[in-house]
Amino acid sequence: MAENQNCARMTRAAAKRKASSMALDENPVSKKRVVLGELPNMSNVVAVPNQERETLKAKTSVNTSKRQMKKALMIPEASVLIESRSVDPQMCEPFASDICAYLREMEGKPKHRPLPDYIEKVQSDLTPHMRAVLVDWLVEVAEEYKLVSDTLYLTISYVDRFLSVKPINRQKLQLVGVSAMLIASRKYEEIGPPKVEDFCYITDNTFTKQEVVSMEADILLALQFELGSPTIKTFLRRFTRVAQEDFKDSQLQIEFLCCYLSELSMLDYTCVKYLPSLLSASAVFLARFIIRPKQHPWNQMLEEYTKYKAADLQVCVGIIHDLYLSRRGNTLEAVRNKYKQHKYKCVATMPVSPELPLAFFEDITIRGMA
């Protein structure tokens, strides 16, 4: 008897499945193959039959028009609109303006800043050139191990902050560099960060594993485990999005050029005193000037978004311009060789005027000069 009931239930279930498949055959839902990244970020996506879809469209259009009427009086700033178009989840577009304000506040806190003159005040055995050689070498190490750019910028930040509080001798400077990169890589290189042995090897085994681990602990204590400070890259990621708005034909070029100029700025000890946001804005200013030398590199949107006027950038832009022309740091080759590669659009070889027009830095209200 039980077997007969089971058979009956199975027969009814089979009949339902057959009826469902026949209904789907009559109203087939078109499908297409999509890349995983293009899939909507929804866990409850279902296939809707065509007839129901038309009804939903009508309801949606009514609701949309109501929402548009409600939002008509709330016109966001142009820079917020740019953020809202971002598909990068790291940009967190619903909270973009709040995040920018928080980063600007955070970058200026003393615990996140190196001393602007730590070599003169704290270090007795180091020179600005030694620091520049270390930074240039760390750029090469980051390329060798294919580390993300955030790791490199954070490494230099850790080095400068550590040297601001702990005097060392020159023989330990390279050890500080690799130990700082080890910390930064563990923060950003989520998949397969380099091991301690890799950093020992890259120094030609000048330092042992125990020395690297010990210096890592010293750096963490000196920084009081404050490892999330904003870097030039933090702001560059956002500023370049605005800078690309009227450079539609050369978006990759301006992005790589901004990165190149930012890495050049890290070579120069003079730039330690500038906030990351100022260095980032200066890189954007100079990159736009290099690509289009006859067009004003700054405009109202950039001023509004970066919170810097062109006049605020003049000295910093001049330093990076000298670095680009090898008037400063001309013996350092790693950064320049990196950006001479085709994968970076050979931006290190782009010609630039030896002089920056002073008119571009006049503190005036810029309107529509994009």
Swiss-Prot record:
Subunit structure: Interacts with FZR2/CCS52A1, FZR1/CCS52A2 and FZR3/CCS52B.
Pfam families: Cyclin_C (PF02984), Cyclin_N (PF00134)
Organism: Arabidopsis thaliana (Mouse-ear cress)
Presence of keyword Cell division: yes
Coiled-coil parts of chain: none
Signal sequence segment: none
UniProt GO cellular component terms: nucleus
Gene3D superfamilies recorded: Cyclin-like
PANTHER family from the UniProt entry: CYCLINS (PTHR10177)
InterPro entries in the cross-refs: Cyclin (IPR039361), Cyclin-like_dom (IPR013763), Cyclin-like_sf (IPR036915), Cyclin_A/B-like (IPR046965), Cyclin_C-dom (IPR004367), Cyclin_N (IPR006671), Cyclins_cyclin-box (IPR048258)
Any Gene Ontology biological process: mitotic cell cycle phase transition
Superkingdom of the organism of origin: Eukaryota
Protein name in the entry: Cyclin-A3-4
Gene Ontology terms, MF aspect: cyclin-dependent protein serine/threonine kinase regulator activity
Gene: CYCA3-4
Family: Belongs to the cyclin family. Cyclin AB subfamily.
Keywords associated with the record: Cell cycle, Cell division, Cyclin
